[in-house]
Amino acid sequence: MTKKLHIKTWGCQMNEYDSSKMADLLNSTHGYTLTEQAEDADVLLLNTCSIREKAQEKVFALLGRWKKLKESNPDMIIGVGGCVASQEGAQIRQRASCVDIVFGPQTLHRLPEMINSVRGTRSPVVDVSFPEIEKFDRMPEPRADGPTAFVSIMEGCNKYCTFCVVPYTRGEEVSRPSDDILFEVAQLAAQGVREVNLLGQNVNAYRGETFDGGICSFAELLRLVAAIDGIDRIRFTTSHPIEFNDDIIDVYRDTPELVSFLHLPVQSGADRILTLMKRAHTALEYKAIIRKLLAARPNIQISSDFIIGFPGETQADFEQTMKLIGEINFDISYSFIYSARPGTPAADLPDDVSEDEKKQRLYILQDRINQQTTAWSRRKLGTVQRILVEGTSRKNVMELSGRTECNRVVNFEGSPEHIGKFVDVEITDVYANSLRGMLLRGEHQMALRTLETPASVIERTRKENELGVATWLP
């Protein structure tokens, strides 16, 4: 009988990536297959996020429902991972004794051993340590799921912004060796992946070791990934303005595979608030980065993050944020009302902005961002956009759906043979959350690179030692 695994994921793209790796790992070691139904699973895993308010309450509410499932199936194993697990540790079991495993973002690779231990001893396991880069060394080979894929290049953050829990839950910055990343990307490309999204809490701080003992910068890594045949689009998430240097901007100038869309969080447009947040840059310095980016890539679109109602934020501070939004002309962006995260420096500041004021400011900001986002979408009307076709449309299975460089969903009529490939589409309609277009040409009519397949690169460089363990020679 097939063993089933159910994973519930909350939070950022890094959590989504981690969950996919958990599924791959447990499939390779224990033969678990994923199920959408928690009641059908032998193992339930909750991958948590602690960024938002009441994160802990949300966790224990779900665990309360899972407890009932375990009462009817005592052999079921329940595990809690992610950032809430890293923060709370063994305290999770004090409130929810049904939990068998508590693991952090840096120990998910130990899940097979943890499950074996629970099965063998019926005793709970708690491991929220920070064994640095070890988790990447013990992951199975990547499995593509469509033409796009996430690839983690680093973990943690050293910036210690006063509102953020990441350094405390994921640890400080640790970069993967560049050759490991390139090999993973080549493996994904060999499986049909055309677009990769490089992941990290602060990707532009990447400093990975090379095969000869040197250090690879983020700008160098971007160019190396772009050189892999089959990879025609590169995105990255997320970056910090303080380390967005000229070398990275130069990549936008000379590497067309890097998309003309950038998510660069600013959080506030008021220097006083940026100082309280310990962001280490001013609004003027942020605008200088954008100015250089536009000089290198005039058609680039910028999205960002904003925190509303940070302790001490005045109406004048908020107006500075609104001014910055207008000056930059941000595209799709994310905004949140400030809520204190336990253990962060900002949690000790007086939360002196009323809830009504926070909500009013959030409404004003989101309304302005929505206006700008709509304007950006309308500019696409009548233009020809290159789309990476991801599959059939969610709303109409007779249509195909894909994304532009600027991350807009485009639906159009076309045959299934285009799935996983690029097409050129003329935009004919603009909607609130998507675009519609007419197919003009398929990939066979484009001049995309076909010099050497990723599979041939892997085969040519793959070596095995006397134990039969495969290695890759750069």
Curated annotation (Swiss-Prot):
**What keywords tag this UniProt record?**
4Fe-4S, Cytoplasm, Iron, Iron-sulfur, Metal-binding, S-adenosyl-L-methionine, Transferase, tRNA processing
GO MF entry, a single one: metal ion binding
Q: Which residues form the MTTase N-terminal domain?
A: 3-120
List required co-factors. Answer: [4Fe-4S] cluster
EC number(s) per entry:
2.8.4.3
The compartments listed are: Cytoplasm
Per the annotation, which location comes first and is thus the protein's main one? cytoplasm
UniProt keyword tRNA processing, yes or no: yes
Q: Which SUPFAM superfamilies match?
A: Radical SAM enzymes
What is catalysed by this protein? N(6)-dimethylallyladenosine(37) in tRNA + (sulfur carrier)-SH + AH2 + 2 S-adenosyl-L-methionine = 2-methylsulfanyl-N(6)-dimethylallyladenosine(37) in tRNA + (sulfur carrier)-H + 5'-deoxyadenosine + L-methionine + A + S-adenosyl-L-homocysteine + 2 H(+)
Cofactor details (free text):
Binds 2 [4Fe-4S] clusters. One cluster is coordinated with 3 cysteines and an exchangeable S-adenosyl-L-methionine.
Q: Which residues bind [4Fe-4S] cluster 2?
A: 157, 161, 164
Q: What class of enzyme is it?
A: transferase
Q: Quick one: which residues bind [4Fe-4S] cluster 1?
A: 12, 49, 83
Domain TRAM intervals:
378-441
One Pfam family from the record: UPF0004
Residues of the Radical SAM core domain:
143-375
What does the entry list under GO cellular component?
cytosol
**Role played:** Catalyzes the methylthiolation of N6-(dimethylallyl)adenosine (i(6)A), leading to the formation of 2-methylthio-N6-(dimethylallyl)adenosine (ms(2)i(6)A) at position 37 in tRNAs that read codons beginning with uridine.
The subunit structure is: Monomer.
Q: Which HAMAP family does the UniProt entry name for this protein?
A: tRNA_metthiotr_MiaB
The record's section on NCBIfam families has: miaB-methiolase, MiaB/RimO family radical SAM methylthiotransferase
Family in the record? Belongs to the methylthiotransferase family. MiaB subfamily.
The protein here is known as tRNA-2-methylthio-N(6)-dimethylallyladenosine synthase
